[in-house]
Amino acid sequence: MVTTEEISLKNELIRLLKDVNCVKFGDFTLASGKQSKYYVDIKKATTNPKVLKAAAKLVNYYVSKENNENLKIAGVELGSVSIATAVSLETEKDLLIIRKKAKEYGTKNKIEGELNPGDNVIVMEDVTTTGGSVSKAVDEIRAVSGNVKKIYVIVDRQEGAKENLAQNNVELIPLVTIEELGLNK
């Protein structure tokens, strides 16, 4: 059931995303390789403290209603680290940073932060199209016996990510959809 608090938090995030003009129009190639007539320049949002705070509050609203035992918040470098950090601060849950490739020096870690077998992990993502990028992070976490059941994304372009991730037993929870930003899929 949707509450007035959820609606209020979501509407504030939508307003802030529009305020930072994060949707651009033109001809773009997305990370998925798809061509698009619009681009969600999410870095305009994820470098804005008001947007980060609003997104973190909305995720905390959702997370506070669930079992939070051994919960960690993960973000994939570079795009999702600021989001995951904001959510970690808001929820007071430990932060994990998932590298795209392992360090070639020191510990040579691919996952930074303390991840123990059996820990529950929520992965944060900035934008999803097909879900391919974030799916790799899920695989990395699961490879070391972490449990990933949910991914929270600031903006879902509604182009298959939800369905693709569901095939990997992961629920994609968009904080905002592209439709809610006023664009058709």
Curated annotation (Swiss-Prot):
Binding of orotate occurs at 129, 157
Superkingdom field? Archaea
Check the record and name the Gene3D superfamilies matching this protein: 3.40.50.2020
Cofactors per UniProt? Mg(2+)
Q: In which pathway does it act?
A: Pyrimidine metabolism; UMP biosynthesis via de novo pathway; UMP from orotate: step 1/2
- A single BP term in Gene Ontology: 'de novo' UMP biosynthetic process
Binding annotation for 5-phospho-alpha-D-ribose 1-diphosphate: 99-100, 103, 125-133
EC number of this enzyme = 2.4.2.10
Q: Which reaction is the catalytic activity of this chain?
A: orotidine 5'-phosphate + diphosphate = orotate + 5-phospho-alpha-D-ribose 1-diphosphate
Ordered alphabetically, the record's keywords are:
Glycosyltransferase, Magnesium, Pyrimidine biosynthesis, Transferase
Family, per entry: Belongs to the purine/pyrimidine phosphoribosyltransferase family. PyrE subfamily.
Query: What HAMAP family would the database entry show?
Result: PyrE (MF_01208)
Report what the protein is called.
Orotate phosphoribosyltransferase
The record lists the lineage as: Archaea, Methanobacteriati, Methanobacteriota, Methanomada group, Methanococci
